Amino acid sequence: MFTGIIESLGKVASVQNVGGDVRLRIETDLDMSDVHLGDSIATNGICLTVIDWGDSWYAADVSRESLNRTTLGSWKAGHPVNVEKAMLPTTRFGGHIVSGHVDAIGEITVVREDARSLYFEVAAPAEIAKYLAEKGSITVDGVSLTINHLRGNILSLNLIPHTAERTNIGTWKAGVKVNLEVDVLARYIERLLLGDKAAEQKTQSNISMSFLAENGFLK
């Protein structure tokens, strides 16, 4: 589990094809002295398992599933990545609960300066829009962010200079694809509201205003 508070801005050192999958090597200035084989490190929001490491790098294998569901398939040597080691019981919980399981790929649509901060708009796939809420949390390329406003599937974000400087956010431009992970609490709430009906659905939620009213959640 992670918090979405980025510890290092790393970069892709190499991308190798291994039997149809991919092996990544990531350069980082993280302290790697406490890393062990099999540890998890979030890389642009993707939970990767360490298979090898050194003082300033780590390597991980990536499955075809991850390549298809994340932006990882477009990474090349030199690509900047946000890096966070898995949290410890003693870690300050400064962000929100992040699993490292990417839900969808979004697209940056607007980038502009807003006083000293940066203003962004991100288009999220329609299927995850139901899990988003104004002032709620979302993980974008591994960064825990607060949704300022929401218009359908378009969410707006404001970032302070500190966050932009310590992450890959400074490289975001209109058209850039980003990894999105919704707040896991939204998924648990959906499951609780649906009850046994959740097991019957495969791809689409049937939560609606009438459903909430019928079950006593709206008056």
Residue ranges of predicted features:
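Conserved loop->alpha-helix
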Residues: 1-219
